[in-house]
Each structure stands twice: as C-alpha cells, then as structure tokens.
C-alpha cells in the first residue's frame, strides 16, 4: 500500500477489523502512522470498541470508519427503530430513527459513518443526519438504554 501511495495510485490507505492488539502492532511499524483509518462495525448495538479501540484511535488522531452504523435497523433483532428513547429523540429533531443512529455514530467528529442506501431518499436523509447535534441529555438517555461497555469486548463482525 505504501508503494501504491508513493506512486500516486492511492491517496491513503487503511485497515479493517483491527482490534487494539492489531492496531498496537501496526502503529509500532515505521509505516504504521501512515494508516488513515480502521474500518470496524460500530453502532448502538455494537459499542464494544468504545471501551479501548476508540480512545486509542483518538489518541493517534485516526478516525474510526464505522460500517453498519444503523445496525441494519430491525433486521438484527435489536429493534432499534422501535426503541422508545430513540423514537422520542427522533421526534425532538423531526428526524427518523435511522438519522438519530447516524447522528449518534458521528457525534464526536472522530467517526466516519458509511451507511448503506438503497435509494436517493435514503441518501438525502443520511446526509441530513450530519446536521443533528445530539445534546448531552440525549446522549445520557441513549447511554441508559445502550450503555458503553465497562470491559474490553471482542470486535463485532458481520
């Protein structure tokens, strides 16, 4: 990847599904700091990286690239779109629950969310999610229902 970067074939490169141990090893390499991002599964139902990986990446000024940031909505069985707290917050912002899920995912400015879109309306709604600034009160409510992990957890994978 470094060769492709030096040849101007790519602007930057990243990794996918690296846990803390993998990132530690990568960052010790001479080219490790050239890594632009780590793409991992991250959403309200899969917050394991909040314990140690997100802080580590923030310390190294490396954004998280979140795949499945809306957890596929109801299809994972977690019924995120039917959760009362999320419905209440979505009404507050005149948004849908998917927009709240995306707004939560990018709340700290250190996460790049890559949601799936099946039509133009979804794309527009996804973009509008970036305009939602969740308040501390919103985050407390969300954390009550979907708490940050208190111990290290393995990466969530597809």
Language-model segments: which ranges?
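Beta/alpha (TIM)-barrel catalytic core signal, keyed to glycine-rich beta->alpha loops juxtaposed to Asp/Glu
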Residues: 1-158
């Amino acid at each position: 990847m470094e060769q492709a970067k030096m040849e101007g074939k790519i602007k930057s490169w990243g990794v996918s599904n690296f846990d803390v141990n993998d990132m530690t090893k990568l960052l010790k390499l001479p080219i490790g700091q050239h890594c632009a991002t780590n793409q991992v599964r991250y959403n309200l139902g899969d917050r394991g990286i909040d314990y140690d990986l997100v802080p580590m990446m923030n310390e190294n000024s490396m954004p998280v690239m979140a795949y499945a940031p809306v957890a596929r909505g109801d299809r994972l069985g977690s019924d995120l779109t039917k959760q009362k707290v999320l419905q209440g917050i979505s009404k507050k912002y005149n948004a849908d629950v998917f927009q709240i899920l995306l707004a939560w995912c990018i709340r700290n400015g250190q996460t790049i969310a890559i949601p799936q879109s099946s039509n133009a309306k979804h794309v527009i709604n996804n973009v509008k999610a970036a305009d939602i600034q969740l308040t501390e009160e919103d985050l407390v409510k969300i954390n009550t229902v979907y708490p940050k992990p208190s111990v290290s957890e393995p990466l969530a994978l597809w």
